[in-house]
């Protein structure tokens, strides 16, 4: 699990205008909440935050918010729909040893059996793990699985200390038969002429 240090500064101005000014200055407005504390408004450096958020379920260590550092997980990230830059982030305060529920990507390994195609129903699985030990992904070995096989959430091999936080009967992927190629118009005309 990666942990990234980011310098945060308290926000004193609120509203749309203040948020726009912060973004123009290269900052991203954020809200810090959790553990029964009142929500706190902060600004984070935009570039550093963008790089950190490229890692799924990254644990951020905020410096400059309190007298001590805060460990947080990004819960909600809002991006500009056109340009893609960060507009706002909600951060959940966590503590070492605390278990949190997060979505972890499924990493497919291997090739399915002959004539089969892997149908990915879910790209992520919801798990409960210690905040400082969230896996970066869960490997799913599909090597040689025959057509008609379903892989459920309960079939996933989870790392030590990680529990499934979703229904174990949920199908996450299945192996289906390859679709027969459709005949082209030229082939159909050729068959009709014979």
Swiss-Prot record:
Pfam families xrefs: Ribosomal_L25p, Ribosomal_TL5_C
Keywords: Ribonucleoprotein, Ribosomal protein, RNA-binding, rRNA-binding
One annotated Gene Ontology cellular component of this protein: cytosolic large ribosomal subunit
InterPro entries reported for this sequence: Rbsml_bL25/Gln-tRNA_synth_N, Ribosomal_bL25/Gln-tRNA_synth, Ribosomal_bL25_b-dom, Ribosomal_bL25_C, Ribosomal_bL25_long, Ribosomal_L25_dom, Ribosomal_uL5_bac-type
Signal peptide: none
GO-annotated biological processes: translation
GO molecular function terms noted in the UniProt entry: 5S rRNA binding; structural constituent of ribosome
Family: Belongs to the bacterial ribosomal protein bL25 family. CTC subfamily.
Record text on subunit structure and interactions: Part of the 50S ribosomal subunit; part of the 5S rRNA/L5/L18/L25 subcomplex. Contacts the 5S rRNA. Binds to the 5S rRNA independently of L5 and L18.
PANTHER family: RIBOSOMAL PROTEIN L25/GLN-TRNA SYNTHETASE, ANTI-CODON-BINDING DOMAIN-CONTAINING PROTEIN, RIBOSOMAL PROTEIN L25_GLN-TRNA SYNTHETASE, ANTI-CODON-BINDING DOMAIN-CONTAINING PROTEIN
Protein's job: This is one of the proteins that binds to the 5S RNA in the ribosome where it forms part of the central protuberance.
Protein name (record): Large ribosomal subunit protein bL25
Species annotation: Thermobifida fusca (strain YX)
Gene symbol of the encoding locus: rplY
């Amino acid at each position: 699990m990666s942990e990234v240090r980011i310098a945060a500064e308290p926000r004193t101005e609120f509203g749309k205008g203040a948020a726009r000014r912060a973004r123009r200055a290269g900052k991203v407005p954020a809200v810090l909440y959790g553990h029964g504390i009142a929500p706190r408004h902060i600004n984070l450096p935009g570039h550093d935050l963008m790089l950190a958020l490229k890692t799924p379920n990254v644990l951020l260590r905020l410096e400059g918010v309190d007298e001590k550092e805060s460990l947080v997980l990004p819960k909600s990230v809002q991006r500009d729909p056109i340009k893609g830059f960060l507009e706002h982030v909600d951060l959940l305060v966590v503590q070492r040893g605390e278990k949190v529920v997060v979505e972890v990507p499924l990493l497919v390994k291997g090739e399915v059996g002959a004539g089969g195609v892997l149908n990915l129903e879910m790209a992520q699985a919801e798990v409960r793990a210690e905040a400082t030990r969230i896996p970066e992904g869960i490997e799913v070995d599909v090597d040689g699985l025959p057509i008609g096989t379903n892989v459920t959430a309960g079939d996933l091999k989870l790392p030590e200390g990680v529990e499934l936080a979703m229904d174990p009967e949920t199908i996450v992927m299945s192996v289906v038969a390859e679709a027969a190629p459709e005949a082209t118009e030229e082939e159909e005309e050729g068959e009709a002429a014979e």
